Structure formats: C-alpha cells, structure tokens
C-alpha cells in the first residue's frame, strides 16, 4: 500500500481523485491511500517517520527542510501539475467571459498555500 499525503485538496488534482474513485490504480495492481495531512509540518514529519510514503506539493518545503538539515532524506521529484494551479471561479457560468469585466469587482486571491 502507498500512503499519499496531500496538503491541500484542490481541483488541479482532480485526475488523481478520479483515478482513485474509479479504481484505476487498483486495476493496475496499486493500492493507494490518499490522506489529507493536517498541516505541512505533519507532512514532513509523517514522511520522515514513515506514516506516509509520498506527498504532492511544491518543492519549497523540501528546500526549506534541506536548508535546516542538509542530510535530510526528503527529495522533490516529478511534476504533477504542468501549469500554474490557480484558477478563477465565478458564481454563474459566463460563456462570454473577458478579464476586463473583472474591473471594479471584488476578488479573493490565494497568496499562500500549504505545499
């Protein structure tokens, strides 16, 4: 069994959630257990202690861990999301959307994510 920690539940990982729900991994002989980590610190500690085998997220946490401990065994590898994962969501469908229509609107912006 592979235990995967995720720091953040987000739509950019939808293909992986779909693979899990449709049992695509088990159809190929893999048993994957996706667990939502309570916070980035537990993700690091869980990986180091063996409570999780892998996690997805940005490389920054691994880099910070190596800065504190150059002998740290954590490794950042692979690429799950190939583009900027931030998305714009509206209340109503708008097939004629244009960015200029956002002028004067209030937006919520994500500036820190727990990766």
Task: Indicate where each model-derived feature is located.
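Bilobed "Venus flytrap"/periplasmic-binding protein-like clamshell domains
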Residues: 2-26, 37, 84-115
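Pocket-flanking alpha-helical
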Residues: 19, 35-74, 86-96
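Short secondary-structure junction motifs
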Residues: 27-29, 72
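Conserved functional loop/turn residues at catalytic and ligand-binding sites
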Residues: 29, 50-51, 106
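Hydrophobic anchor at the start of a short beta-strand
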Residues: 32
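Conserved residues at the C-terminal ends of beta-strands
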Residues: 58, 80, 110
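Short beta-strand->loop
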Residues: 73-81
